[in-house]
Amino acid sequence: MSNNPRSIIAIVPAAGIGSRMGADKPKQYLMLGQQSILGHTLDTLLAHPDIEQVIVALHPQDNYFNQLPQSQHPKLTQVVGGGERADSVLAALDYAHNYNPGAWALVHDAARPCVTHQDITQLIKSVAIHPQGAILAAPVCDTMKRSDASGLIVHTVDRSLLWHALTPQFFPVSILRTHLSAALAAQVPITDEASAMEWAGVMPGLVNGRMDNIKVTHPDDLQLAALFMSQQ
């Protein structure tokens, strides 16, 4: 693995309840074909040759995870997550730091089952040009509008430098842990790992990822994810 970190630990925050899906269980456990969304996500991460370990942060009352076949995989570790995504990531980073403080964290959304090995490998290799860390992202293609508080268009936003932030996001375990912990202590709104790094003054790299790496958020996304996976 030339120019790549020696130890890569994937982190999957999976403690959320996914209320926008309106389902009877957390969205990561909804079926996508023959197995759950989370099952597909974990299969991809566990099978990647550069990933040494996968840490899944779970809700303390999770009654579903141990029913997944992936829960018994020797590369997989469970930790108790927190109330927000960032809290779950930090809990996993604490474990990863104790395991190997020199490792790199590959943080990936549980509800992005369409991520490919090609994109993961491309992100890992980007360390050669982005030693501070990087994220998968996709350029904004739609026309972007800024509104006022009443919902009226104020102006059209220049999209030439706008990107959709995707996952995985890839940073050194110890550095991300330090910055994420400090940002949460300062009550900074953290929506992804890159935002914690940005708050600390780090400028993460952007790695162009596939547009089919969608996050399953609404019911219609399940059919779209199934279509994308059938074409990969």
UniProtKB/Swiss-Prot annotation:
SUPFAM superfamilies: Nucleotide-diphospho-sugar transferases. This is 2-C-methyl-D-erythritol 4-phosphate cytidylyltransferase. It catalyses: 2-C-methyl-D-erythritol 4-phosphate + CTP + H(+) = 4-CDP-2-C-methyl-D-erythritol + diphosphate. Pathway: Isoprenoid biosynthesis; isopentenyl diphosphate biosynthesis via DXP pathway; isopentenyl diphosphate from 1-deoxy-D-xylulose 5-phosphate: step 2/6. The gene is ispD. One of its GO terms (biological process) is isopentenyl diphosphate biosynthetic process, methylerythritol 4-phosphate pathway. The record marks 159, 215 as: Positions MEP for the nucleophilic attack. Its EC number is 2.7.7.60.
